[in-house]
């Protein structure tokens, strides 16, 4: 081989190797402080789940059964919600491939899956296992789990089947045997995926309800810490730096409540706090957003760990509860433009904290039954996704 040919051969090898490294790195969803992470929550209820069919939704379409029965409670009330793409199953990989393409095209690059496990076993796992993880393009999207460890009341999930709001299908607290099953299953099935989202080498694992977490360990903070330390050690055995536990409460309340919860998450060794809903509900979306910023400021005052902002698209859970009406929904100024303005403030918030990952959480990707979703519908089309893209492209920076 002559000298010129050798040089080209070596150069080609370097290029191929560089491309290989880039491809490998692109599938690893490790947070970097210079990158933005826009994470949308997924409520995986719209498919035929065995436990769901037996106890909750009987027609084989999951919660679409309830969503389709939404009815207007006041003039101009947009019910039932109508998906632009129709009533698709969230455990269909072809559907999720479309989701991932739409999300990544518009600046959403992480999905947070609500994940359920009761003493009776798993619930709604198929959306993640068969939908997301079998989507051909899934590794272009980061993901992590939020353990949705809340009780499952009868009327919350299907008021048309149950009118009894005092009984529950499953209790959220789990015993030690089930807890160790959770730990093993989560590490083996999910943490090992190259696109599982990590902070400082630690897979992120969200927890929705602190009180129910404590109840799984007899109500003891000390025993709960031991349980979480067990999870951490098992993750280290699997080759990870530990587990980044993240608290995602359903909404905000008082400063005193924030102080109590901040002390608890730090005693348990949590790594961060965000929210499932942004809190501060109001009929006016602008007031709702301003209230949520005050709640964010409360958390900032009491936390010694990172807080990541949450932005809700809206709120309307009237399909679940016949007694609710106008005062229980967000219906003034609830538009993609208002949402974009609020998201731009969240972006500014993370920009002002250069020492922590630039993570923003959006409620939600598909909370149709709660009126909070980015997915395109028959009213706004792709309006909310376009709003995310505009903000992440800097088009709203001039309004700061």
Where are these regions (language model features)?
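Glycan-processing catalytic domains of CAZymes
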Residues: 29-400
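Bacterial N-terminal signal peptides
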Residues: 10-20
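Bacterial Sec-dependent signal peptides at the C-terminal "C-region" and cleavage site
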Residues: 19-32
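Bacterial N-terminal signal peptides that target proteins for export
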Residues: 2-10
């Amino acid at each position: 081989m002559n000298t010129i040919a050798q040089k080209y051969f070596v150069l080609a090898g370097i290029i191929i190797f560089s491309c290989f490294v880039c491809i490998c790195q692109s599938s690893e969803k490790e947070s970097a402080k210079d990158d933005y992470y826009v994470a949308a929550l997924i409520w995986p209820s719209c498919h035929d789940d065995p436990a769901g069919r037996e106890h909750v939704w009987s027609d084989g379409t999951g919660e679409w059964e309830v969503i389709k029965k939404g009815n207007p409670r006041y003039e101009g009330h947009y019910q039932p919600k109508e998906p632009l793409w129709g009533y698709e199953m969230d455990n269909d990989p072809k559907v999720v491939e479309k989701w991932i393409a739409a999300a990544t095209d518009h600046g959403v690059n992480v999905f947070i899956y609500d994940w359920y496990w009761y003493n009776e076993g798993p619930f709604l796992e198929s959306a993640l296992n068969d939908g997301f993880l079998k989507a051909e393009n899934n590794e272009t999207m980061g993901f992590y789990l939020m353990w949705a460890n809340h009780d499952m009341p009868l009327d919350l999930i299907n008021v048309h089947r149950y009118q009894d709001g005092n009984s529950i299908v499953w209790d959220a607290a789990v015993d030690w045997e089930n807890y160790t099953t959770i730990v093993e299953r989560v590490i083996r099935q999910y943490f090992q995926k190259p696109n599982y989202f990590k902070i400082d080498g630690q897979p992120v694992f969200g927890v929705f309800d602190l009180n129910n977490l404590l109840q799984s360990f007899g109500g003891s903070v000390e025993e709960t810490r031991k349980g979480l330390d067990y999870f951490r050690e098992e993750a280290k055995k699997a080759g990870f730096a530990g587990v980044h536990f993240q608290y995602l409460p359903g909404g905000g309340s008082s400063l005193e409540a924030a102080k109590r919860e901040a002390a608890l998450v730090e005693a348990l060794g949590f790594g961060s706090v965000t929210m499932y809903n942004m809190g501060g509900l109001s009929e006016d979306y602008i007031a709702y957003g301003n209230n949520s910023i005050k709640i964010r400021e409360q958390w900032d005052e009491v936390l010694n760990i990172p807080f990541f902002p949450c932005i809700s698209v809206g709120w309307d859970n009237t399909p679940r509860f016949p007694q609710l009406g106008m005062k229980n929904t967000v219906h003034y100024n609830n538009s993609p433009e208002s949402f974009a303005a609020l998201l731009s403030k969240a972006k500014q918030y993370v920009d002002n904290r250069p020492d922590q990952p630039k993570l923003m959480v959006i409620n939600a990707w598909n909370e149709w039954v709660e009126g909070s979703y980015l997915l395109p519908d028959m009213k706004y089309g792709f309006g909310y996704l376009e709003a995310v893209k505009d903000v992440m492209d800097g088009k709203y920076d001039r309004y700061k």
